[in-house]
């Protein structure tokens, strides 16, 4: 399996690789994320919200022979763990991607004290603390210049309660008013469904994210199809199933996201 750099990574720490046929991703991770994915099967309520996984990636020389030097160096640097995931952008011509981190508390219970202090400071100074969510990256299509506009994690940290809706609007920067309204409505409906499923799941999701995706190339003035509108739960390294505990820390962020998307829709 030949690999290349994944060009649509909106946020995250490790460089993701993608197969030459664009069907699967190789995502660097830690052991706890590999272990958590092993517990995700079609018997769980959140199954459809989690990208399909195909097990742990065990690299061989065949995986990286012949790819460009940058991707080769990345692949060789994966001395730890990596997991094989479906590429939810597969067959999208112009995917637009937004990564949003959920929760006011951003650290797992086993995090050392210094990490807790650092992440608590991040939460207090951003919308993570006030709203329970924070935009960590956006890749949106700029039709005027025929290129992508990127919004970074650092940019997301500058947003406040008063302008975060405007920040969300950047995800739809090249859409017409009607396209944007229908996309926002589609994502709003998905968020409401996700909220219901999450509220019925005994799970703890610390520092997880929601990935929003749509294909700009599929839009047209009469757009009404949701097949290229995707919402997925990602970054599950610090997730665990619980016996009888609902994750209110994450739900706060989801509820506020629903409110903000409703405001986006109302503004149209």
From Swiss-Prot:
One of its GO terms (molecular function) is inositol-1,4,5,6-tetrakisphosphate 3-kinase activity. Its EC number is 2.7.1.127, 2.7.1.151. Pfam families: IPK. Substrate binds at residues 127-135. It catalyses: 1D-myo-inositol 1,4,5-trisphosphate + 2 ATP = 1D-myo-inositol 1,3,4,5,6-pentakisphosphate + 2 ADP + 2 H(+); 1D-myo-inositol 1,4,5-trisphosphate + ATP = 1D-myo-inositol 1,4,5,6-tetrakisphosphate + ADP + H(+); 1D-myo-inositol 1,4,5-trisphosphate + ATP = 1D-myo-inositol 1,3,4,5-tetrakisphosphate + ADP + H(+); 1D-myo-inositol 1,4,5,6-tetrakisphosphate + ATP = 1D-myo-inositol 1,3,4,5,6-pentakisphosphate + ADP + H(+). SUPFAM superfamilies: SAICAR synthase-like. ATP binds at residues 27, 86-88, 99, 235. The keyword RNA-binding does not apply. GO terms for biological process: inositol phosphate biosynthetic process; phosphatidylinositol phosphate biosynthetic process. It is found in: Cytoplasm; Nucleus. Belongs to the inositol phosphokinase (IPK) family. Inositol phosphate kinase with both monophosphoinositol and diphosphoinositol polyphosphate synthase activities. Able to phosphorylate inositol 1,4,5-trisphosphate (Ins(1,4,5)P3) on both the carbon-3 and carbon-6 positions to synthesize inositol 1,3,4,5-tetrakisphosphate (Ins(1,3,4,5)P4) and inositol 1,4,5,6-tetrakisphosphate (Ins(1,4,5,6)P4), and then to subsequently phosphorylate and convert either isomer of InsP4 to inositol 1,3,4,5,6-pentakisphosphate (Ins(1,3,4,5,6)P5). Also converts (Ins(1,3,4,5,6)P5) to InsP6. Also has a role in transcription regulation. This is Inositol polyphosphate multikinase. The lineage of its organism: Eukaryota, Fungi, Dikarya, Ascomycota, Taphrinomycotina. The gene is arg82.
